[in-house]
Amino acid sequence: QVAEGERLEADGFPAYSSVWGDKDDYGNRGERYLAGVAFLDGAAHRPSAVMCRGYYTRSYLWAVDFDGKQLTTKWLHASLTPHDWVVMDGDGKVIKEAHGLSATAFAQGAHSLAVGDVDGCDEITYGSAAINHDGSLLYSTGLGHGDALHLSDLDPDRPGLEVFMVHEERPYGSDFRDARTGEILYRTLDRDDTGRGVAADIDGRHRGFEMWSLDSKEVRDCHGKVIADDPSQMPAMNFRIYWDGDLQDELLANGRRPHFAPYLQKWNGKKAVPLPLSNGKHLSDMGHSVSNNWTKATPNLQADIFGDWREEVIYWDENDASHLNIFTTNIPTEYRIPTLMHDHIYRLSVAWQ
């Protein structure tokens, strides 16, 4: 066994200084990194770390195993062009490849990834593409980069999992697709960059999740039916959260005063309204709490840390960045649900956060 805190290394990932591709060879584009944990051999086996670089052009996903003593490469996926991908082993030998495709993971990534089991082993949803447990390309929709995506059983009346994603390039807007095949179940179009979108179960009158984004400014059910269309009453387009005692999602929003000022929202069937804490205050009123950015309202971490199935949210103290403020609900609930960390996709999602 290695000593606690001992540094471990494994070769195989593209060097930090590597740049590539016309306008995209500068640091902001080449140095985009994501990471996650995936049970690539199935839930009964050890998990792998998946380290990722690049999503505006070339995309690399590096799966690494740890046996308690050393790191070893499981595989390295490289989508080098829009039409070609290869998978290499730890010695750099090509073990799988495909050429002349209509789309790969090249330029398809998002600002986050998602991990979930769609066929018995975990796969990585990499924006508009998905990488199989063996490093091969599972599918690519070709709809390109986006700022947000959600992977879950969004439609309980369909078998398997679904993905909701928004896209930066016009006119792609958003898409709702099968997580295993990439089949587009419905989509919306837009004339601009659709920079925000959320899938959350905010309305108990409709089965499954509801979805909304900046492009259409409509709330739709999981079948694409519009259930609310007042642009001035759209819910926040950031994070969903379990906070009060019912079984619907609440939302994390950001206000302008002061900057990066987080607060909770609740959907009432027609519009989203602020949801104060039990003391009548909002998250930003306590401990000088601020989010990591404004338009996405990103907290330091959101997870069911304490285990009663409602979620905690952590923000940093604007007056003292060494302080973290942990918020938890004190609202009673009549529902007894196992801690969310027992859910496979949820636990992996906390890891990639």
Identify the meaning behind each predicted range.
Residues 1-353:
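Extracytoplasmic/lumenal domain signature
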